[in-house]
Swiss-Prot record:
Zn(2+) binds at residues 182, 245, 262. The lineage of its organism: Bacteria, Pseudomonadati, Pseudomonadota, Gammaproteobacteria, Chromatiales. The gene is aroB. Pfam families: DHQ_synthase (PF01761), DHQS_C (PF24621). It comes from Thioalkalivibrio sulfidiphilus (strain HL-EbGR7). Catalyzes the conversion of 3-deoxy-D-arabino-heptulosonate 7-phosphate (DAHP) to dehydroquinate (DHQ). This is 3-dehydroquinate synthase. Keywords: Amino-acid biosynthesis, Aromatic amino acid biosynthesis, Cobalt, Cytoplasm, Lyase, Metal-binding, NAD, Nucleotide-binding, Zinc.
Length: 361
């Protein structure tokens, strides 16, 4: 087992990474301050892991709420199911919520914890690669709105993150590839040596080599923890973690939540950001080629859906958390391992990128 720490002063917390951690009560008990625990999970994960986690938390009074599975259920209505379960069971402010599932479960559970009785503790137990390397770390929580993804939410840090890499054994191939998109992102935004490693080891990751996956998870969490420690509430540098997300969220929203997986949208969004960076003269041709090639090798889409026109892209991108004072800020690349957040770009480069949708350029 390996442990990292997200350094946030008196709100610092550990990230435990290893095999069999779902069965290890010592990873959980020290971070639970009350006697009652509500596990929040979904219909897919519950049959696989809920009973195991209940046994591990046997020293506490444990209840569970099982939600429907899918991005299309990341809504206020689903969030209300969690509130109802907590209220009906008379949970108080000493409650601890445990998110057992992927990114949707983590985001909903975290937002419920941030808002129930004005804030209770929660623990992240991510079971997908995407949630293990990205959404479980950093305290972003929330739900979607029909007009925009993740537009309703709060920053609320977990008490700890417990990553049992054995849960990846039950992860569908498409979900694994979607998670690899977020892994590639770290190489692109701040860790060129990691990008080099990914080029050399992509086949091992796709084959689910345990050592390669463990290394990729640890390195990704390390990179994210450093960025979050520098800028917890995304006032500056943390926004680089959104590489590909403005384009990607537009794809997810425009196609209907759940049609494209989040990681698939991010993958295509990163390619679009790289192409725009090349148009601006910031990214050289070789780095663009390497970016496109690695994402394609991971089995991820590199072209946006032709159903979303340039005009529709622009409309969807205007509803984005990175819009400030009416100005769209984008995360772009000056090289592999060097991302920038900027509103200072030639709009013609963005227009050209959006108008190339479907052309492969």
């Amino acid at each position: 087992m390996q442990t990292l720490t997200v350094e946030l002063g008196d709100r610092s917390y550990p990230i435990h990474i290893g095999r069999g951690l779902l069965d290890d009560p010592t990873r959980f008990a020290p971070r639970i301050r009350g006697k009652r625990v509500m596990i929040v999970t979904n219909e897919t994960v519950a049959p696989l892991y809920l009973d195991r986690l209940k046994r591990t938390l046997g020293d506490f009074r444990v209840e569970a709420v099982i939600l429907p599975d899918g991005e299309e259920y990341k809504t206020m209505e689903t969030l209300n199911q969690v509130y109802t379960a907590l209220l009906e069971a008379r949970f108080d402010r000493k409650a601890t919520l445990v998110a057992l599932g992927g990114g949707v479960i983590g985001d909903i559970t975290g937002f419920a914890a941030a808002s129930y009785q004005r804030g209770v503790d929660f623990i992240q137990v991510p079971t997908t690669l995407l949630s293990q390397v990205d959404s479980s770390v950093g305290g972003k929580t929330g739900v979607n709105h029909p007009l925009g993804k993740n537009m309703i939410g709060a920053f609320h840090q977990p008490r700890c993150v417990v990553i049992d890499t054995d849960t990846l054994d039950t992860l569908p191939d498409r979900e694994l590839r979607a998670g690899i998109a977020e892994v590639i992102k770290y190489g692109l935004i701040c860790d060129r040596p990691f990008f080099d490693w990914l080029e050399a080891n992509m086949d091992r990751l796709l084959a689910r080599d345990p050592e390669a996956l463990a290394y990729a998870i640890h390195r990704s969490c390390h990179d994210k923890a450093q960025v979050v420690a520098e800028d917890e509430r995304e006032g500056g540098r943390r926004a680089i973690l959104n590489l590909g997300h403005t384009f990607g969220h537009a794809i997810e929203t425009g196609m209907g939540y759940g049609v494209w997986l989040h990681g698939e949208g991010v993958a295509t969004g990163m390619v679009m950001a790289a192409r725009m960076s090349r148009r601006l003269g910031w990214l050289d041709a070789e780095d663009l080629h390497r970016t496109e090639a690695l994402i394609a090798r991971a089995g991820l889409p590199v072209e946006p859906p032709p159903e979303i026109t340039a005009e529709r892209f622009a409309e969807l991108m205007s509803v984005d958390k990175k819009v400030l004072d009416g100005q769209l800020r984008l995360v772009l690349l000056r090289g592999i391992g060097e991302a920038v957040v900027t509103a200072d770009f030639d709009p013609a480069a963005l227009d050209a990128t959006l108008n190339q949708v479907g052309s492969g350029n």
